[in-house]
């Protein structure tokens, strides 16, 4: 169903595919779209994802068929074949992915035929369909990962008992994805596991090729990546464990204990790791408690994020900072089945907030203004202050309108430079504490 989107917080499906390729080692995208399509998307992703920049032969450097009027009239298959051939000649990549856009889908180019013409055993080529009418960037994330992991990589003859894959964190559209993945990997390695994150600096294309050897897929999202891990289980026989991204000590300890129900982890080691990490976490946290208590920094709060961050952020604010988390806005364009999955996950996590699904920035602003009444001459009234908003760079103006403070954490995140920052796990929880209270100190 169509919906009105004002100041969007996502792109089309092609944008999601571009963001994945931007972060995935050894893979290059060949963009079969109209002139300017890939460049515009790359600029939006690069700037909106914490100014993450472009990868090698990704983003603004990616090969493109640059379809124009001639190809629209006579077809663009020959132009695509030419572009793939040239890309194979000059780019040293392990895998080439041809991604389509709206124009080339509408004129009906036979992309599969073009791919078959140029197949090279040393440089394989696959294709995906990513026009805007297939979904937004999060759908593009699922489309490209499904193609690579469930249609391209080989089936493993034998599983590695301690190897796990991480899915659900969406590169770029979760702007803190690298830091989040690093922290999850660090914790799991402390438990004796081997971890494929696919998108961190230590990963190579071999991690992609060997993903089918994993004994378990860990899905850190209530909605995104579900298609990927379900198809992965059918194709490769690998079960999955689905949960939300853990932020802070309480959520992370719970996550690790639940994980131990799905893969063999030594119970004594598990409790030792949780204890040492928790002790370190609160030893550092308590150093900030004097400043927090003396300044009376206890807030009404709201979050405006995607599905991946909505629940863990709200729970962290409520249970670890002791704030009154009133409104949780989720800005994804969710189909009914994903809406139900999100609502179910939200209802299972009690932090006293109201869940609102809305893609419209202006409507979100109006809602927050309505719930924070201005003084109309009364002697007493509840103005619900002080107020803190965790959202995107778009939401700073809304926070200012209601007399609050904002920390941008979600896409589009153009007002911060993100390299290794992440909020997942124990260390990520402390990083979030630092960022929140540094914003107040500033």
What are these regions (language model features)?
Residues 1-442:
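An N-terminal assembly and electron-transfer interface module characteristic of large anaerobic redox
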């Amino acid at each position: 169903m169509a919906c009105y989107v004002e100041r969007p917080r996502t792109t089309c499906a092609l944008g999601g595919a571009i963001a994945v390729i931007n972060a995935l080692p050894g893979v290059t995208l060949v963009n079969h779209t109209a002139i300017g399509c890939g460049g515009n998307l790359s600029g939006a992703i690069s700037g909106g994802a914490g100014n993450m920049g472009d990868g090698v032969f990704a983003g603004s450097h990616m090969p493109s068929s640059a379809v124009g009027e001639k190809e629209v009239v006579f077809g663009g298959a020959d132009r695509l074949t030419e572009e793939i051939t040239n890309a194979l000649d000059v780019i040293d990549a392990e895998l080439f992915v041809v991604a389509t856009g709206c124009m080339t889908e509408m004129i009906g180019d036979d992309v599969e035929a073009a791919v078959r013409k140029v197949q090279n055993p040393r440089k394989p080529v696959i294709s995906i369909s990513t026009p805007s009418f297939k979904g937004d960037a999060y759908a593009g994330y699922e489309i490209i990962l499904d193609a690579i992991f469930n249609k391209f990589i080989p089936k493993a003859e034998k599983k590695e008992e301690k190897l796990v894959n991480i899915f659900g964190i969406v590169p770029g559209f979760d702007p803190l994805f690298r830091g989040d993945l690093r922290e999850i990997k660090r914790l799991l390695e402390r438990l004796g596991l081997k971890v494929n994150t696919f998108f961190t600096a230590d990963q190579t294309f071999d991690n992609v090729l060997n993903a089918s050897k994993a004994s378990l897929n860990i899905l850190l999202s209530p909605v995104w990546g579900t298609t990927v891990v379900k198809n992965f289980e059918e194709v490769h026989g690998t079960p999955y464990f689905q949960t939300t991204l853990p932020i802070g000590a309480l959520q992370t300890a719970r996550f690790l204990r639940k994980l131990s129900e799905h893969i063999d982890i030594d119970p004594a080691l598990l409790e030792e790791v949780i204890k040492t990490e928790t002790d370190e976490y609160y030893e550092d946290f308590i150093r900030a408690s004097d400043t927090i208590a003396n300044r009376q920094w206890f807030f009404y709060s709201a979050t405006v994020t995607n599905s991946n961050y909505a629940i863990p952020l709200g729970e962290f604010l409520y249970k670890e900072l002791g704030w009154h988390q009133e409104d949780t806005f989720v800005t994804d364009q969710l189909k009914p089945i994903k809406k139900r999955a999100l609502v179910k996950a939200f209802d299972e996590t009690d932090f006293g907030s109201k869940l609102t699904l809305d893609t419209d920035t202006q409507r979100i602003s109006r809602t927050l203004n309505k719930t924070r009444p201005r003084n109309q001459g009364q002697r007493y009234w509840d103005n619900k202050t002080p107020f803190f908003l965790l959202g995107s760079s778009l939401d700073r103006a809304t926070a200012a309108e209601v007399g609050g403070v904002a920390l941008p954490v979600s896409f589009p995140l153009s007002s911060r430079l993100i390299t290794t920052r992440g909020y997942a796990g124990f260390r990520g929880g402390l990083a979030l504490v630092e960022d929140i209270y540094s914003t107040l100190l500033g």
